[in-house]
């Protein structure tokens, strides 16, 4: 098997400083993995010509391309006129058409005679006698009835078009039902991850002027019951716009109910007739707000609208996951994040897929829970995050070896870049070296996947998201706005509007323009750095802030992290810059390891390992060992907080998405 080549010494590095502000590329990855002939023969997109035809049409004749796509893949109650009214930075797609994202996700399949197809397979966390205690399946016809009942209940509570509904629930079928019910009647859902604090819930309620909160009495997590309703009650003390609270009974624990405000799901929803039809809605009717953390200030409410988002979620799901009849698809994301919106609910359901939802932790009651689920439900497509893959590696191969994973035919990665070594473990241990891996790049703001291998045709390189999907026109520019060559990285921009693009930051037009559209004229600034190699493959090099300027050389932290993680005793690594009088910035690394001792010998070994993998320029100045890295609740490493730790500064910016303060507190104590 080919191996990654690497620069051996500082003589391989650029000799002069980088005046244009492009990023020096120092890590080389030349392993290439082709899909099997058997996989390609059955793939939805099975030839390079098919991809080129789609990509060329979308790039050169976008109106014609997207008109055909929208007419074929969405149901229209009333036809649209203009395909895209583009007045930078604002786009309107499928102007004056009327559709409904809930209809496209549910009713369309029932109307087509596929109502008996399984839509959702759900498994709760609790286990009794070695078996899951709670399991349910919903066909598309049953899902249609449940969603209609919920829509009727919401209407009874005074919710209508344009009203904002905050949803703070565990990963149960009712969460998907609530989202779809909002879409059915034109309400705007704002799903809040069930784990955020009361302060964070209130902040989101107030920013969106939410009228209703839907929650549950509690949820199960690692064998414990966590009270959700009590957290919501505290939030509602500071949420003056909220009029009602709809509560699902999940755990059966006590949940104080405030008369006149709080109502039970089983009283309001379950006894409804379930006959309410989906409401025809204008293409640009807001579908949902989803809050993401800002580096400073309050969280941003990313706004997506109905038709463009729905089409993008559906088509990207079909292209990337090669969906076929009979697949059991499992995206492990929570619906509190964009991945759950696009690839648990709207994308797969619009495509008529059978989706698995799991409520709990990946390591309860043991570290093999995911593989037990894959085996029992015969999951064929698995879409998970690099942070989960790294945890699986740390827990040990023996948990994987207990189970038959032969049902898997396709693997996916989402949330952040996956280090080549984690990619290789995923490929070998979970995929049995037969499953293509779709390493996807996209954002909350983009609505759906923007770059990914197409599994039937794209040779993959560990760590690369490969090529843009049809309709995505990327460009990479330096600090001066000039295009960069394949030897350098720069700011990743998108040059052409696409249907799934965000329509704004809710209630904050100035921030929307400043953050995404002010840097490069008429181009969407992703906030990520990237490079494009000579094969046209894209490599994400981290956030724009995740670049270190060492002696005039701009280095990607992702490449240094990948080198560290390639050491067999390193589980995870995060690299940041800290001020340095001579070099401008020094390289500071935070490392979690296996059982290896955290001594100077190991530090020096890791420094030499990076030097050998990349070169002297990228050798860390400082290496700090930690039991855990500070992460968001969606599993992303919060490098900006580590920058503050490395520099000895007070923490600044929004920390509401931080999962566990203890890891950060421990690092601060060591200063």
From Swiss-Prot:
It is an enzyme of class 6 (ligase). Its cofactor is Mg(2+). Keywords: Acetylation, ATP-binding, Ligase, Magnesium, Metal-binding, Nucleotide-binding. ATP binds at residues 415-417, 439-444, 528, 543, 554. Mg(2+) binds at residues 565, 567, 570. Signal peptide: none annotated. GO terms for molecular function: acetate-CoA ligase activity; AMP binding; ATP binding; metal ion binding. Gene3D superfamilies: 3.30.300.30, N-terminal domain of ligase-like. InterPro entries: Ac_CoA_lig, ACAS_N, AMP-bd_C, AMP-bd_C_sf, AMP-binding_CS, AMP-dep_synth/lig_dom, ANL_N_sf. Acetylated. Deacetylation by the SIR2-homolog deacetylase activates the enzyme. The modification N6-acetyllysine is found at residue 636. It catalyses: acetate + ATP + CoA = acetyl-CoA + AMP + diphosphate. Residues 1-21 are annotated as: Disordered. HAMAP family: Ac_CoA_synth. Catalyzes the conversion of acetate into acetyl-CoA (AcCoA), an essential intermediate at the junction of anabolic and catabolic pathways. AcsA undergoes a two-step reaction. In the first half reaction, AcsA combines acetate with ATP to form acetyl-adenylate (AcAMP) intermediate. In the second half reaction, it can then transfer the acetyl group from AcAMP to the sulfhydryl group of CoA, forming the product AcCoA. NCBIfam families: Ac_CoA_lig_AcsA, PRK00174.1. Belongs to the ATP-dependent AMP-binding enzyme family. This is Acetyl-coenzyme A synthetase. It comes from Rhodopirellula baltica (strain DSM 10527 / NCIMB 13988 / SH1).
């Amino acid at each position: 098997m080919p191996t990654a080549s690497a620069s051996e010494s500082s003589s391989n590095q650029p000799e002069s400083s980088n005046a244009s502000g492009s990023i020096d590329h120092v890590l080389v990855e030349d392993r290439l993995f082709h899909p099997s002939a058997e996989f390609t023969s059955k793939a939805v997109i099975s030839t390079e010509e098919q991809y080129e035809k789609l990509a060329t049409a979308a790039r050169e004749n976008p109106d014609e391309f997207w008109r055909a796509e929208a007419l074929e893949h969405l149901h229209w109650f009333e036809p649209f006129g203009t395909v895209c009214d583009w007045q930078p930075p604002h786009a309107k797609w499928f102007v004056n058409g009327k559709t409904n994202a809930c209809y496209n996700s549910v009713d369309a399949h029932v109307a087509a005679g596929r109502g008996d197809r399984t839509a959702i397979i759900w498994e709760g966390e609790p286990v009794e006698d070695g078996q899951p205690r709670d399991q349910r399946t919903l066909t598309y016809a049953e899902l249609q009835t449940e969603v209609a009942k919920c829509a009727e209940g919401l209407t009874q509570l005074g919710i209508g078009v344009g009203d904002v509904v905050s949803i703070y629930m565990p990963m149960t079928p009712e969460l998907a039902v609530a989202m779809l019910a909002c879409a059915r009647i034109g309400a705007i859902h704002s799903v809040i991850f069930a784990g955020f604090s009361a302060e964070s819930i209130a902040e989101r309620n107030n920013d969106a002027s939410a009228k209703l909160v839907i929650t549950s009495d509690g949820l199960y997590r690692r064998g414990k019951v966590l009270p959700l309703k009590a957290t919501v009650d505290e939030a509602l003390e500071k949420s003056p716009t909220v009029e009602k609270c709809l509560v699902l009974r999940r755990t059966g624990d006590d949940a104080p109910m405030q008369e006149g405000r709080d109502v039970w799901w089983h009283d309001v929803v379950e006894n409804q007739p379930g006959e309410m039809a989906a409401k025809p809605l204008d293409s640009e009717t807001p579908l949902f707000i989803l809050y993401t953390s800002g580096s400073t200030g309050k969280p941003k409410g990313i706004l997506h609208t109905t038709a463009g988002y729905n089409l993008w979620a559906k088509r990207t799901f079909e292209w990337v996951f090669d969906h076929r009849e009979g697949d059991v698809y499992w995206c492990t994301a929570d619906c509190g994040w964009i991945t759950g919106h696009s690839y648990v609910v709207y994308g797969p359901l619009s495509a008529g897929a059978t989706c698995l939802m799991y409520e709990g932790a990946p390591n309860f009651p043991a570290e093999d829970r995911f593989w037990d689920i894959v085996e029992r439900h015969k999951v064929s497509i698995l879409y998970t995050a690099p942070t989960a893959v790294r945890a699986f590696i740390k827990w040990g191969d023996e948990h994987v070896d207990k189970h038959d994973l032969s049902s898997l035919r396709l693997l996916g990665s989402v949330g952040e870049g996956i280090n080549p070594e984690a990619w290789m473990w995923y490929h070998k241990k979970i995929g049995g070296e037969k499953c293509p891996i779709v390493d996807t790049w996209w954002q909350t703001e983009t609505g759906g996947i923007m770059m990914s291998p197409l599994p039937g045709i794209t040779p993959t390189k560990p760590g690369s998201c490969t090529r843009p999907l049809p309709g995505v026109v990327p460009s990479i520019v330096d600090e001066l706005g000039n295009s960069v060559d394949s030897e350098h990285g720069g700011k990743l921009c998108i040059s052409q509007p696409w249907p799934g693009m965000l329509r704004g930051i809710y209630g904050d037009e100035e921030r929307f323009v400043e953050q995404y559209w002010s840097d490069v004229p008429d181009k969407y600034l992703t906030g990520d750095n990237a490079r494009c190699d000579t094969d046209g493959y894209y490599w994400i090099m981290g956030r724009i802030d995740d670049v270190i300027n060492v002696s005039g050389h701009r280095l990607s932290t992702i490449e240094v992290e990948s080198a560290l993680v390639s050491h067999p005793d390193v589980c995870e690594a995060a690299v940041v810059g800290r001020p340095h009088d001579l070099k401008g910035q020094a390289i500071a690394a935070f490392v979690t390891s296996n059982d290896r001792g955290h001594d100077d010998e190991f530090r020096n070994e890791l420094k030499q390992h990076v030097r050998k993998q990349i070169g002297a320029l990228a050798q860390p100045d400082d290496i700090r060992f930690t039991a855990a890295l500070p992460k968001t609740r969606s599993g992303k490493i919060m490098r900006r907080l580590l920058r503050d730790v490395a520099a000895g500064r007070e923490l600044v910016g929004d920390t509401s998405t931080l999962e566990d303060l203890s890891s950060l507190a421990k690092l601060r104590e060591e200063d």
